[in-house]
């Protein structure tokens, strides 16, 4: 998947994430699908595996191609307070121990179990980039399926150690997967990277 499409799918998670009332998620999904079609991105939302934290997309021509995107911090959303608490933990170097981040990992694994993609790509912005990194680093199930991942200004702490404690096997597996960390110069959230 090209970087622009990956970034657009990460951006679209915010459209779904901003819904404060759960029953309005289908309207947000319709808006996202329309936007993706207008942008010429051949993916659509998988409603049953999309919530306010993680959006799942499938290729319209080949449903075995799946893209999972983790949402970043979104003030004013129903997840906003959890997002901010996670951000504070990231700033203190404790992001990998955050419940919100760990739940995203478990949900991602459930999505993979349910959809069993032939091709899996992933993306995330800010907090979503950090939770994506955690998920990839800590989940063998994800690494076994993952073809590519892009993070955009992934959350990190410039004051504390951000390293994931990875097994030697995980480190070896990660060398085989193209994971690109895109960072905007002077972005304070990702400064630790």
Predicted feature descriptions by range:
Residues 127, 153-155:
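Catalytic metal-binding/acid-base residues of hydrolase active sites
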Residues 13, 18-122, 140-148, 155-159, ...:
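A conserved cap/lid and substrate-binding interface adjacent to the catalytic center
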Residues 152-153, 183:
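Alpha/beta-hydrolase-fold catalytic nucleophile elbow
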Residues 132-140:
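Short glycine-enriched nucleophile-adjacent loop
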Residues 184-192:
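Acidic catalytic loop of the alpha/beta-hydrolase fold
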Residues 168-178:
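A catalytic-pocket lid/entrance helix-loop region that shapes and gates access to the active site
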Residues 124-128, 132:
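Gly/Ala-rich beta-loop-alpha elbow adjacent to hydrolase catalytic centers
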Residues 131-132, 158-161, 191:
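Extracytoplasmic/secreted cell-surface and envelope-processing proteins
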């Amino acid at each position: 998947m090209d970087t622009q499409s990956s970034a657009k799918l990460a951006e679209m998670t915010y459209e779904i994430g901003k819904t404060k009332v759960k029953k309005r998620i289908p309207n947000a999904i319709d808006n996202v699908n329309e936007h993706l079609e207008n942008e010429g991105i051949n993916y659509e939302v998988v409603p049953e595996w999309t919530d306010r934290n993680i959006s799942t997309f499938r290729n319209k021509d080949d449903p075995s191609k799946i893209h999972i995107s983790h949402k970043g911090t979104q003030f004013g959303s129903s997840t906003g307070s959890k997002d901010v608490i996670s951000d504070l933990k990231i700033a203190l170097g404790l992001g990998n121990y955050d419940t919100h981040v760990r739940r995203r990992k478990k949900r991602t694994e459930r999505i993979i179990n349910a959809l069993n993609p032939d091709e899996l790509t992933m993306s995330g912005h800010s907090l979503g980039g950090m939770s994506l990194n955690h998920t990839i680093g800590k989940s063998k199930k994800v690494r076994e399926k993952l073809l590519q991942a892009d993070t955009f200004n992934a959350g990190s702490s410039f004051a504390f150690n951000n390293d994931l404690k990875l097994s030697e096997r995980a480190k070896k597996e990660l060398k085989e997967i193209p994971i690109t960390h895109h960072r905007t110069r002077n972005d304070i959230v990702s400064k630790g990277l």
